[in-house]
Amino acid sequence: SAKVMTLAQALGVLLGSAIGSSLTTQLIAFKITDFALVLIFSGACLFLFTKRSRRRSLGQILLGFGLIFYGMFVMSSAMAPIKDYPLVAAMIISLENYPFLAFLVALIVTAILQSSAGFLALLMTLAGQGLVGSYAMIPFVLGAHLGGTITGVLSSLGTPGRESKRAAWANFGFKLINGLLFLPLYRPSTTFVLWSSPDLSRQIANAHTIFSL
């Protein structure tokens, strides 16, 4: 809206941020959230107790990443008791048989969380508890991709310029077409992703990366 970038440049940034989000998911699959407090402590020490600007900048980066991963760790931990509620667990498991419904659930939850990586971190937690089947993975990932664009669309509505609106809606349209194109092909797509790793959390991260490219 500040007319600093053209529409093409803005779309490039949005598509690049999607790839960056997929890298965050890859790090979560590596269980880096277990080291979130270490990152926070290291970043805080570098920022508070050093005078060199480069070290302070590195401290800010580590602190930022640590807080992001700790937030995802807290959200994921909050989902852990779900397996103790049979009705809720059964509803989640049943979504494997209803790919379009799984797509919509992922879209809505991601829009609420305002983060596709955050939703997929929760999905990995549920997968670790055996509540997410392999064939629900692709619909969830596609829904998360589309849901992640909702924040940009809503934010653009309050901006005066047309370029920001066009960029946000173009990003939404691209992800919508991507979802509608691959959702009917979720079974062969799942078969392809299953080859990438024996671990379901890693498969989710790989699917997120593939559909972000």
Provide a role label for each language-model segment.
Residues I40-T50, G64-M75, V105-T110, N178-P184, ...:
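Hydrophobic core segments of alpha-helical transmembrane domains in multi-pass membrane transport
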Residues G16, G20, S42, I68, ...:
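Alpha-helical transmembrane segments of polytopic integral membrane proteins
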Residues M72, K83-L95, G158-L213:
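Transmembrane alpha-helical segments and their short flanking loops
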Residues L27, K31-L63, S164-F172, L176-S189, ...:
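A structural-propensity feature for long, helix-poor, extended segments
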Residues Q26-F35, R55, A89-E96, Y135-M137, ...:
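Interfacial loop-to-helix junctions that mark the boundaries of transmembrane helices
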Residues S1-S22, Q26-F35, F47, T110-G147, ...:
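Membrane-interfacial helix-loop connectors
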Residues L62-I108, L126:
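Helix-loop-helix hairpins and the membrane-proximal interhelical loops
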Residues A8-S17, I61-F69, S94, A106, ...:
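Alpha-helical transmembrane segments of multi-pass membrane proteins, especially transporters
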